[in-house]
């Protein structure tokens, strides 16, 4: 069965309601790479899915209290073993970048696709994550006029620090599937 427009067939769908329509006529030309782990430093649970679908119980972990009432999402999450989850269709605007600026343009959510990597900024990302990210980039470039890639820290400096020092930009951009994207930082 083919995927619906804006959905990747190979991704596990976990639909979020934390999205809205992009402004008319805006080209989707930027990928934003993030990292996330909930609770911090722990991998493999379902807390990220629960956060992006407004089902995270703030009592489940002391660190979750700060997330109470937060309404956020990303288009994709890539787990440590390379599993791909999709929360929002790429044609829609996920709520991943917050207050942000890229090459003089404000509100990066309007023209970007947000990709979360399961990670915490303290550990290296995995080979399956890099491979899955490269394949995802290849698929997204077939649908959208993507030209740029940046980290959340690039578009929200001082406010955000992901994907962090352990993300190897050279390694990603050397993969053939990720070729053609520019990182102006």
PLM features: residue spans?
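Basic/polar, cationic surfaces and motifs that engage anionic cell-wall
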Residues: 1-9, 24, 106-111, 120-185
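N-terminal catalytic cores of peptidoglycan-degrading enzymes
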Residues: 1-106
């Amino acid at each position: 069965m083919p995927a619906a427009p804006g959905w990747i067939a190979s991704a596990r769908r976990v639909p979020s309601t934390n999205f809205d329509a992009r402004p008319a006529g805006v080209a989707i030309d930027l990928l934003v790479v993030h990292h996330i782990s909930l609770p911090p430093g722990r991998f493999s649970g379902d807390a990220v899915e629960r956060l992006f679908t407004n089902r995270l119980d703030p009592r489940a972990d002391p660190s979750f209290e700060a997330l109470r009432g937060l309404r956020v999402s990303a288009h994709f999450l890539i787990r440590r073993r390379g599993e791909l989850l999709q929360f929002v269709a790429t044609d829609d605007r996920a709520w991943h970048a917050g207050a942000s600026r890229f090459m003089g343009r404000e509100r990066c959510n309007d023209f970007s696709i947000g990709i979360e990597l399961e990670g915490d900024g303290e550990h290296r990302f995995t080979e399956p994550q890099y491979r899955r990210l490269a394949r995802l980039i290849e698929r997204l470039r077939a649908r959208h006029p993507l030209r740029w890639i940046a980290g959340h820290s690039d578009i929200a400096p001082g406010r955000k620090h992901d994907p962090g020092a352990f993300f190897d930009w050279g390694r990603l951009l050397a993969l053939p599937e990720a070729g053609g994207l520019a990182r102006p930082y």
